[in-house]
Amino acid sequence: MNILIVSQYFYPENFRINDFAQEFQSREHKVTILTGTPNYPGGDYYEGYGAFKKNRESYEGIEIFRSPLIPRGSGSSVRLALNYISFIFGSIFTSFFLLNKKFDIIFVFEPSPITVCLPAIFIKKIKNIPICFWVLDLWPESVVSAGNLKTGIIPKILNPLVKFIYTNSDKILVSSRGFINSIVEKGINKNKVDFFPQWAEPIFKPVKPDKNNLDFIPQNSFKIMFAGNIGEAQDFSSIIEAAIILKAKKNIHWVILGGGRKEDWVKAEIKKNKLENCFHIMGSYPLEEMPEFYAQADCMLFSLKKEYIFSITIPAKVQTYLACAKPIVAMIDGEAAKLIDDAQAGLSCPSESPELLAENITRLSTLGKNELDKLGQNALNYYNNEFERTMLMDRMESIFNKMTD
């Protein structure tokens, strides 16, 4: 099968689509990528790349066509808009170099923005091939929520655009069941919308650490670890509030891996509230080092603010926590909270509930090793039953086969 993947992001940027493309290439399909010039997350072109530099290359036998775009820069609203729009036009331009190639299907990877599908629709119309659209970020809900734009011109522009994209997609896969109703309510046939979750990369599995990365924390402490973006959506104000509540419990330590727009604010709050002895910002590390860090934590944390879009979202980090057999403590509403409960992998409380988060952490910190290990084993069992990579890849291959029969 000849598969054209359209994704604004691809290697050397670190996204799950890299793993997907390599897997399908290894299954003896011919994979071609239409993507942008790498600039995520730093906001500048990666070394060796430019708008019209290194636009054609090969990675693991996969042919890559890179479109020129304006890098995202500091991530301001204006710069992101320019980044998204320039990818649309740059990819349509670049797609002319693909028109002499044979493709059986177009697979669109959408962590955001949804407009990544527009170049795919352009190619579909010319070559008459089906589009399978994998939606990881629900538009317009996510952008409206993030920008507090529930009224005004932005929703009026986005709503018909989103409907156009969904209408022109032959199959829509969603990473959370909560997305389905929202898409169907836009007038889309429910029969072409299916749940297809994210998986954890193969490196995420239970491991024994080779070294102690947390040797600055007393040995018998209870370590809560957060890995990922330190942003507005993750509600670090409530996490800090929970840390303040637990400040007197000297055995509880918070370990934060990652970075983001709120990192400086979090550091200032740590200093302001004298949390330096228990709240540790460690910065970002390569993805391949994450399982070893996870192995040194007693439980893994994730949280999202109280917004409708977040209540129907399952953050990708959840699968990595489950795959590494880690107990989970979460401050989240809706789909992700239900997942933790169904898996019996830890404790959850509603979004923006620092007091309840503190209570749940206290409860977990009093459990013995065997009880924590049981939660971790529940997490791994649930992952293997619901999100295991090979199982999902087989299912995707079956979807592609049905679409191309």
Feature locations, PLM:
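A charged, aromatic-enriched C-terminal amphipathic alpha-helix characteristic of glycosyltransferases
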Residues: K211, L356, K369-N401
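Carbohydrate-associated surface elements
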Residues: T37, G178, F196-W199
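Acidic donor-binding loop of glycosyltransferase active sites
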Residues: D170, C278, Y294-S311, K326
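Conserved donor-binding/catalytic core segment of Leloir-type glycosyltransferases
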Residues: F216-Q234, I239-A243, V255
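N-terminal subdomain of nucleotide-sugar transferases
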Residues: M1-E60, A248
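Nucleotide-activated donor-binding/catalytic signature segment of Leloir-type glycosyltransferases, i.e.
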Residues: L257-G258, D264-P291
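Membrane-proximal helix-turn-helix segments that form the acceptor-binding/catalytic region
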Residues: F20, F96, T115, F122-I126, ...
